[in-house]
Amino acid sequence: MIDLYYWTTPNGHKITMFLEETGLKYKIFPVNIGKGEQFEPEFLKVAPNNRIPAMVDHEPKGGTKPISIFESGAMLLYLAEKTGKFLPADLYGRYDAIQWTFWQMGGLGPMAGQNHHFRNYAQDKLQYAIDRYVNETNRLYGVLNKRLSDREFIAGDYSIADMACYPWVVPYKNQGQDIEQFPHVKRWLETIKLRPATERAYAKAKEVNPNYGQPAIRTEEERKILFGQTASVVR
C-alpha cells in the first residue's frame, strides 16, 4: 500500500496518473496547501521541503521497511522502477525518458509555474515578469512540439516523461499560450486526455478538492500562506 500525500496541482496529478495506470494500491491523504497543511509536523517528516506530492511505500521492492519519497520526479522514477513500467529497460530508451522528465522538472514546471504566478496571482502586474515567463513557456512549448513532430509520445512508448509534462500543459490558457500554434502538442494532449487512467486521475482531483478548477487563491489568508513563505516556516 502507498500513502500518497496529495493536492490538486500539476505535480500531484503526475502521481495519480501513474498510480491509476498501474493499478497499484494507494490511499490519498489530502494536503490542502491553501490552509497551510503542508507545514504540519507529520507531513514534514515525509516532505521536508513542505511541498506536495510525497508518498510512503509500505511495501518497497527489495526493502525491509517503508520508504518515504518527496519530489514528483523522484516519485515517478521510483514507481517506474518498482513496477517495471513506463520506463524503458534499455540504456538508450531509459535515459531518453529520464532526461525529458528532468526537462520538465527543471524547465517546463518552474517556468510555467512562475508564468501562472505573475499572470494570474501577483497583485502587482509586472509586465517584464509576465513577458519573461510567458515567452519562456512559449519557447518550451516549441521544444516539446518539435520533439513530438515525429513520434506519438515524448520518449518512445508512453512513459513517465509524458506523465511529468502533461499536467503542466493542460492549463495552457492560463499560461497565455495558443495551443493551435503547437499542433503536435495539441494532438499529444488530446491523446493522453482520453486514456482511462488519466480520466480517473483527474476525477480524483474533483473528489478530493470540491473547489478544483476554480481560482487557487480566494482569500488573503491563502495568498499569505502560499506566497509569503520564508525560512521561518521551516520547523
Predicted segments — roles?
Residues M1-D131, N135, N145, T219, ...:
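GST-like domain detector, emphasizing the conserved glutathione-binding G-site
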Residues N32, I160, A205-V208:
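Short, solvent-exposed turn/loop segments enriched in Gly/Ser/Thr/Pro and often Arg
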